[in-house]
């Protein structure tokens, strides 16, 4: 009974307080403080979440970095199927072989002339080309360069710049990187022009080169301008498809097309062709 009286008194006091002017002043304050408390609570919760999100992002970034590092290590351990031109350039830098600018500048084009033959099967035609060039200018020397022979000499000389690379590639049965043959030819021509032989006006006849348009462009960038690309009509038509794989045949024909597009291709005929020797002599005189 006494407890009920106290509860009743408290309810009456509360009702009286709520309807009093003082309560009207206190209530907004209580409401506002409660609302502010909720906002502070959300900010605290957000602040707690931010470090977690940041931590997760850091972990993801570290995971990707670790995966990239491991995969790159694995790729480096994988045996190379072939060497790219950029990798060959890196090899030159690592071995101390400095790449130089163009060997024969434009002001020397009249002194040193380059005649390239992408494919030749019958070497007797080389002699005819030499004879024709000798007729047009007897004072000029003719030098025949065989890249296959240069590569063989480079491999056999253990002290040569590219000997180790050539032997390693051959041992692993890997193709030569783009630019390697041109670099060996450049090395040889550089040797020739810096000897007594280099004082003479010279025609350089390079056989079975270039066999890709990339090598052709590289030659003119690194060595000198090509005067003529000689296309051996009979050999290209009959021997080339029988002697080399289809891909190499296509590459050599692309070389012919490239030089034809810049008006440097000259078709040479032989006595084995349908055309007669008289027409052949006319063609040779145009060199």
From Swiss-Prot:
Localization: Mitochondrion membrane
Topology versus the membrane: Single-pass membrane protein
The UniProt record lists the keyword Oxidoreductase: no
Transit peptide start-stop: 1-14
Cellular component, GO annotation: mitochondrial membrane
Lineage: superkingdom: Eukaryota
Listed transmembrane segments: 55-72
Keywords: Membrane, Mitochondrion, Transit peptide, Transmembrane, Transmembrane helix
Protein name as it appears in the record: Altered inheritance of mitochondria protein 36, mitochondrial
Name of the gene encoding the protein in the UniProt record: AIM36
Family designation: Belongs to the AIM36 family.
């Amino acid at each position: 009974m006494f407890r009920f009286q106290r509860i009743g008194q408290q309810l009456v006091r509360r009702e009286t307080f709520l309807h009093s002017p003082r309560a009207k002043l206190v209530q907004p304050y209580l409401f506002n403080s409660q609302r502010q408390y909720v906002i502070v609570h959300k900010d605290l919760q957000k602040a707690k979440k931010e470090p977690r999100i940041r931590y997760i992002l850091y972990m993801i970034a570290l995971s990707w970095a670790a995966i990239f590092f491991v995969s790159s290590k694995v790729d480096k351990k994988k045996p190379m199927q072939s060497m790219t031109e950029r990798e060959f350039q890196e090899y030159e830098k690592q071995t101390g072989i400095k790449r130089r600018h163009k060997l024969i500048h434009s002001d020397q084009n009249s002194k040193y002339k380059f005649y390239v033959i992408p494919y030749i099967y019958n070497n007797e035609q080389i002699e005819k080309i030499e004879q024709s060039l000798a007729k047009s200018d007897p004072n000029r020397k003719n030098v025949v360069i065989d890249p296959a022979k240069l590569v063989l000499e480079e491999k056999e000389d253990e002290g040569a710049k590219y000997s180790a690379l050539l032997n390693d590639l051959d041992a692993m049965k890997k193709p030569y990187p783009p630019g390697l043959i041109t670099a060996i030819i450049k090395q040889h021509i550089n040797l020739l022009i810096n000897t007594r032989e280099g004082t003479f006006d010279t025609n350089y006849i390079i056989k079975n080169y270039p066999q890709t348009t990339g090598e052709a462009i590289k030659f003119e960038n690194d060595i000198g301008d090509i005067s003529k690309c000689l296309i051996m009509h009979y050999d290209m038509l009959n021997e080339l498809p029988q002697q080399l794989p289809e891909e190499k045949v296509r590459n050599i024909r692309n070389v012919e097309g490239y030089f034809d597009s810049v008006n440097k291709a000259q078709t040479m005929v032989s006595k084995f062709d349908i055309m007669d020797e008289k027409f052949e002599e006319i063609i040779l005189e145009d060199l």
